[in-house]
Amino acid sequence: XVGDLKTPAILRVTNAYLFN
């Protein structure tokens, strides 16, 4: 769901922040 849609978006932002 919906959680499956929100969580990847958060992970992308988090990963972008951490791996920059």
From Swiss-Prot:
The UniProt entry's GO CC annotations, sorted and at most eight, read: cytoplasm; nucleus
* Any one GO MF annotation of this record: DNA binding
Q: Which UniProt keywords apply?
A: Cytoplasm, DNA-binding, Nucleus, Phosphoprotein
The UniProt function text for this chain reads: Binds DNA.
Q: What is this protein called?
A: Implantin
The entry's localization annotation reads: Cytoplasm; Nucleus
- Explain the post-translational modification: Phosphorylated.
Main localisation: cytoplasm
Please tell me whether the keyword Phosphoprotein is annotated for this protein. Answer: yes
What upregulates or represses it?
By progesterone.
Its tissue distribution reads: Uterus and embryo.
- What family does this belong to? Belongs to the EF-1-beta/EF-1-delta family.
